[in-house]
Structures are given as structure tokens and as C-alpha cells.
């Protein structure tokens, strides 16, 4: 193998056994709910942490896969989706071409 892939380099940064980015989003949301409505919302943090740790137990990239699913299925609404009810993923962006008028 010419260019080996070291699996340790692909692991996300973990805090309390959960990837740092989903943990920050979840704890920030719970903190905002606790500030806006009631301090009792802070009791949801251990429950959310436990749920995230259970999800991560099998695959440490689970939250990345969930984000990709949401981004590709629900957030990516292109022109083909309205007509074909499907989504196309391509590395190229196609622009409409102008028609050239032929001179007689």
C-alpha cells in the first residue's frame, strides 16, 4: 500500500466519550433553554449525554453520518428534486448555457 490510512487520524475529538462538536451543540441548546425558560432544563444534559454515548458506542462517526444524511436528503433541494423527487450528487456545478444565434 502506497499511502496508508491511519484510522486514529480520522477519529473526532472526544469530550466525556462524545464527539466535541455534537456535545457543544447539544449542551449549548440545553443551556439556552435553561436560560430562556427554566433552570430545570439543565437536568436534560445527563440524559442527552447518555443518549449520545449510546449512539457512539458502535461507531464514532455516527453524528457525521447523521449530519450527511440530513444535509443530502433534507437540506439539499436542487432543481431536479421538484420534478423527479430525487437528488443528484455530482462534483460539478452545471450552469445554463446561452444559446448562440447563428448568423446567416
Curated annotation (Swiss-Prot):
The chain crosses the membrane at residues 30-50. Keywords: Cell membrane, Membrane, Transmembrane, Transmembrane helix, Transport. It comes from the Bacteria. It is found in: Cell membrane. Induction: Cotranscribed with ptxABCDE. Activated by the two-component regulatory system BvgS/BvgA. GO terms for cellular component: plasma membrane. This is Type IV secretion system protein PtlB.
